[in-house]
Swiss-Prot record:
UniProt keyword Acyltransferase, yes or no: no
Superkingdom of origin: Archaea
Residues carrying the site annotation May act as a substrate filter by repelling compounds with a negatively charged alpha-carboxylate: 71
Region (Tetramerization): 1-44
Organism per entry: Methanococcus maripaludis (strain DSM 14266 / JCM 13030 / NBRC 101832 / S2 / LL)
Protein name: O-phosphoseryl-tRNA(Sec) selenium transferase
GO molecular function terms attached to this record: O-phosphoseryl-tRNA(Sec) selenium transferase activity; tRNA binding
Consequence of substituting residue 307 to A: Loss of activity
EC nos: 2.9.1.2
Residues binding pyridoxal 5'-phosphate: 72
Gene name per UniProt: spcS
GO terms, biological process: conversion of seryl-tRNAsec to selenocys-tRNAsec; selenocysteine incorporation
Amino acid sequence: MLDFNIEGLIPKNMEKRGELVLNEYLKEIEDVFNHRKIPENGIDDEKIKLFLKFLSMMDTDKDPKSVRIGEREARTYSKIHEELSSGFCHGIGRSGNLVDPQPKASGASIMYALTNKILESFFKQLGLNVHAIATPISTGMSISLCLSAARKKYGSNVVIYPYASHKSPIKAVSFVGMNMRLVETVLDGDRVYVPVEDIENAIKKEIELGNRPCVLSTLTFFPPRNSDDIVEIAKICENYDIPHIINGAYAIQNNYYLEKLKKAFKYRVDAVVSSSDKNLLTPIGGGLVYSTDAEFIKEISLSYPGRASATPVVNTLVSLLSMGSKNYLELVKNQKNSKKLLDELLNDLSKKTGGKFLDVESPIASCISVNSDPVEIAAKLYNLRVTGPRGIKKTDHFGNCYLGTYTHDYIVMNAAIGVRTEDIVNSVSKLEKILL
């Protein structure tokens, strides 16, 4: 692509040596274009910046001879705008399709297509052979896209929602103008879950009413709410031939969830939605949508109205290139060890306080019962500069996902991907000072 002549400027042996160094430096960038998969080892930031700069310079707003008379010409007032968008000021997509190439943005279009290819290779490394797109919107809005696609392709008009006290998916259903049928949770010891037979009964009732239901299940959520049994739900949805969308916000970071997804994909799963920030350590703002159904992924991309910001997609790409598969798997391993440490520390603390280390199902978060106002305890932790814990009263039907009275007041703490060991130790230490 580049053609410049340095012959005769320096001795031939030096010329060859210089070309060797340059080619070696650019090899990782060349591999991204040629192999279109996540690198095993991460690429350093300077090379990623060069890679992004190279692509962004292909967009028409960088053409010094371009005559720009449209209403949308990537005109920016400040250089900061260009920096924040990594130079992709035209964004991605066209008004009719998120993944369509944008004629004014050759570089951004290549960047987005590469991101999706690399994302698919990343999932393959994790054992999921899926089609995938990085979305420029977070989990809740990405769920809206999936529901909109289900309505268009299958005529779905009501969402069966096994109750989880998460405002984002609830608002996602409202946003696309679909009705919702909640399926209530039940209590089993310390755990809260939704029986699959109740989900099936809800599907039957909606079909009897002449509606076309789809199911929005929850794979990842705060305990004591269990993961939905997505494998059995997938079997039910296959049997009734109805769409099944899974909210797997932080499912990618732990093998416990990945194994469930592998099994569920054998049956009816139309799409899974995950968060880029919760799994790939990006700034908030992007989503990951994946499925074994390439046509449904296409339908989802068609549901996005208008052109989109490239920035959330660039953030996803940067994380994939910077981490590489080897470092990501190491982060996954560290997360598992961090959760083990959190469990041990909270279990020890519960014995000191006379509370209970709750028997819940989560590879990410843990719960400990408390004998005083949990909301006040969480507030004290915040004032001690600890962010993340949730304090839930047993009478808080929304917080504990249970419409009855839960067994305990409790605190939830997380050991998600990227957490530092010292943060786990310090947070439990500060909680101990509050409780004792």
